[in-house]
Amino acid sequence: MKILPINTKSKNYKIYIGHNIIDKFNFIIKKERINFKKSLLIVDKNISKNFIKKINSKINCEKKITFLFNSSERNKNLTYINTILEILFKNNFARNDMIICLGGGI
């Protein structure tokens, strides 16, 4: 697992990157004392539905949203970024809410 530290003027935080990281999800949440009310799971449609269910079962929050998309070079564009931003805005995501991205090419 790779930990990428992010340092800003207002807050420092970490981005966790790695294989099978979902098995460490609850450990990371407790270790970092992360509190969030909403989660957005951005998933490549090639990811199995059972794996998506497994991930959602690990996430404990008030509102869970899953956004599926086709992993294709055509879809790596501002339209998809705007779609994701619209989901965040329409659901009143805050800075302390969770975004999880899974799959190749996201």
Question: Predicted regions: what is each one?
Answer:
Residues 98-106:
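A phosphate-binding catalytic loop at a beta-strand-loop-alpha-helix junction
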